[in-house]
A protein has these predicted regions:
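Substrate-recognition element of Asp-dependent hydrolases with the DxDx(T/V) motif
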Residues: 36-39, 117
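Short, structured coil segments at secondary-structure junctions
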Residues: 30, 67, 125-126
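Short, well-structured N-terminal submotif of metal-dependent ribonuclease cores
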Residues: 1-36, 48-64, 91, 136-144
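Generic structural signal for small/hydrophobic residues in well-ordered secondary structure
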Residues: 6-7, 44, 82, 107, ...
Length: 146
């Protein structure tokens, strides 16, 4: 099984005190089965630029994300899936932010299971396989602080 890590799943690893349950699970996943999306890295960079300690956060992303997970591009094939999902959800009266739909489309196109802490949110996207390990690890450690 191969996985695409959502922004919150990558952010968890970058936290000062990440979930030990999540880190143990992640350590068992071979490097070649770990992916994220260029959309996720964009969200991470946006967050870094919002911090006063911008350079520290930027360096953390650059040193700890691309060397560890394969960053998949957002391309024409993925954008077609995005368009299909977006149209389907709009017809159903559901609105999900475009970045999340782009991340989901990347996972669907590449046949990857999405690791996210936001199962309810992404669960509305047809054809998307979700992995609840991050959400479960958070419920196992409700008093964890960053």
């Amino acid at each position: 099984m191969s996985y695409l890590f959502d922004t919150d799943a990558i952010s968890e690893v970058l936290r000062h005190r990440p979930s030990k349950v999540y880190l143990r699970w992640l350590a068992a996943i071979p490097r070649e089965e770990q992916f994220t999306s260029a959309v996720v890295t964009g969200e991470l960079y946006k967050g870094a630029y919002q911090y006063a300690a911008r350079e520290l956060h930027l360096r953390s992303i650059e040193e700890r994300v691309p060397p560890v997970v394969t960053v998949l591009p957002y391309d024409v094939a993925v954008s077609r899936i995005f368009g299909m999902i977006r149209a389907h959800l709009e017809e159903a009266g559901l609105i999900i932010p475009d970045a999340d739909l782009q991340i989901a489309a990347t996972a669907i196109y590449h046949g990857l299971e999405l690791v996210t802490g936001n199962i309810q949110h992404f669960g509305r996207i047809p054809g998307l396989r979700l992995n609840p390990v991050l959400a479960r690890s958070r419920s196992a450690s409700p008093h964890r602080r960053g």
